[in-house]
Amino acid sequence: LKLGFADAQETAIGATIVKTEYEKMIASGKHDVIISSCCHSVNALIQKYYPSVLPYLADVLSPMLAHCRVIKEENPGACAVFIGPCISKKEEAELYGECDVALTYEELEAWMNEAGVVPAGDSTEPDEGKRGRFFPIKGGIIKSMHTENTGFTYLAVDGVQNCIAAIKEIESGALKNCFIEMNACEGACINGPAISHHHKPLLSGEVKVVAFAGDDEFRVAMPIDTFKNIP
């Protein structure tokens, strides 16, 4: 409150919206290969250097954008601020307009220190683990989805060079009936560049995420439109 925030929510809510749209795309039978659209760095890489692969990139909002859209539909006039470990989200926020400001954890920490804000201990009761909380780890998008009996193969790729190799393989037409989760950061979002000294070793961080997630689903109101026109 001291910094001007009225509420705080998990963007795992937005992740739940996005993974639901991915499930619908697969169930529709209209897509042969689908690339996840959550990582803006991957999206930008495809848009700039591999435009022939754009038809395979899911035309679905990222969790950040989907969550911000829901917040604004439910709270007209609200200013939506995303906070995370990703620098690329700043450009994404500027491009699409759903998110008013994208901050990194490092920027938030500096702001709190400047304002003399000391975080209080977590007083909330733990809830049932939610699938959407898997998103920030490698394979987490897939882990959040219902993948049984779809006829699709689910693959997770992380690291820029691995993503480029996967994109070239898709471009060659070698893959069929595949959903491919792509993250530019090795280890996915929990290994993002702007976490500062709070950064945990990769495996320890993944263990924490898995312990916080689970099989339950967030009960979310789907936004009026979850699709975006890729610029």
Language model: regions and residue ranges:
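Iron-sulfur-associated redox domains of electron-transfer enzymes in respiratory
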Residues: 1-231
